[in-house]
Amino acid sequence: MSREIRSLESIISDARENTHEKMLIRKQRDMTTDIAPERDLQGRFCSLRRIGEGTYGVVFKAIHVRDNVKCALKMIRTDRDEEGIPSTCLREISCIKDLQHDNIVTLFDIIYANSKLYMVFEFIDRDLKNLLEMLEPTNSVLPPNYVKSFMWQLLSALSYCHLRRIVHRDLKPQNILVSDSGVIKIADFGLARNFSFPSRNYTHEVVTLWYRPPEILLGSQRYSTSLDMWSLGCIFSEIASNKPLFPGECEISQLFKIFEIVGTPNIKSWPGVDSFPHYKAVFPQWPVNLKKLEETSCLTGNGLDVLREILRYPPERRLTAKGALSHRYFLQNGFTQNRPSVTDLMKDIRAQNRTPPLLNNHQEKSIF
């Protein structure tokens, strides 16, 4: 074992001591032999361009020299004096390294060099949020065949993950990549984790606010795959209407926006809801408002039925990813799994907008 790998193992073993991380750390120790030792990164990658930055590092677009393949380099800062490798990075590697699915972003390599961890992913030109933003100037929405294709691919990826007992916990348009050929890829597994049966307590600090399910907002720490399904329901509505379904400004605002459409829950509609830490008997009482759901989501017929079956409480009554794939929504009108071209769609959008393509104009910058 090389010095670099031993060093990484030392960081991992010293970085996390609390109970919730121990299983993840053990898995990561087993994985250190898969992490490449320090190499001449400058000789392996070229045409580097910074395309994003997060709490723990920076993402660069690059080209792998030998294979002439575009890739995304996620550079993770490590600090031996503080936390070392962030837990989100450990979780992402642990969850995604063995996932092989057409609709999940591929992790090509893991490189530890110069006290930094590099995760090398396949590169996709845009995310779903970028695509939806291009439609805004003309108040347009995605054509129905795109909506259905995107939803099918997302459900396929989630069904695959959930079968392997992995819950993503942070589904949102920014974490869904869209290729020119119309292929959808779920990315950013930084909050993902393996779940257990029966369910156990987990942190409730998951999922971006607009896509957070009501049980989490009410303080529940017990959840499983139904959490992802609620988020996907919100995304389904958003890609059909090009506007967020529940755009709350804070947690209580988010709850009330949900209640205004799905109805205020009670012990009859949701047995046990009164036991959640943040549940209040004095919540405003809203009835189920299917008309508002239809108007907001722009979905009708079988599409609206899928959305209704997903946005249900209690969570165990929600449609599963596997179940949704068998819904008549995907069986009507001769639906096929052929992916509509996003390149053609963007040409039409730009023609209407008369604007140049969305490009990231950051200058090339060395990361070494």
Curated annotation (Swiss-Prot):
The keyword Aminoacyl-tRNA synthetase does not apply. ATP binds at I51, G52, E53, G54, T55, Y56, G57, V58, V59, K74. Disruption phenotype: RNAi-mediated knockdown causes arrest at various developmental stages. The few animals reaching adulthood are sterile and have a protruding vulva. Gonads have an abnormal mitotic zone characterized by an enlargement of the distal germ cell nuclei, a reduction in the number of mitotic germ cells, a reduction in the mitotic region length and abnormal expression of gld-1. Embryos have persistent ruffling throughout the cortex and mislocalization of par-2, which remains cytoplasmic, and par-6, which remains distributed throughout the cortex. The active site is at D170 (proton acceptor). It is an enzyme of class 2 (transferase). InterPro entries: CDK, Kinase-like_dom_sf, Prot_kinase_dom, Protein_kinase_ATP_BS, Ser/Thr_kinase_AS. Its EC number is 2.7.11.22. Its cofactor is Mg(2+). It catalyses: L-seryl-[protein] + ATP = O-phospho-L-seryl-[protein] + ADP + H(+); L-threonyl-[protein] + ATP = O-phospho-L-threonyl-[protein] + ADP + H(+). GO terms for molecular function: ATP binding; cyclin binding; cyclin-dependent protein serine/threonine kinase activity; metal ion binding; protein serine kinase activity. One of its GO terms (cellular component) is cyclin E1-CDK2 complex. One of its GO terms (biological process) is regulation of gene expression. This is Cyclin-dependent kinase 2. It comes from Caenorhabditis elegans. The gene is cdk-2.
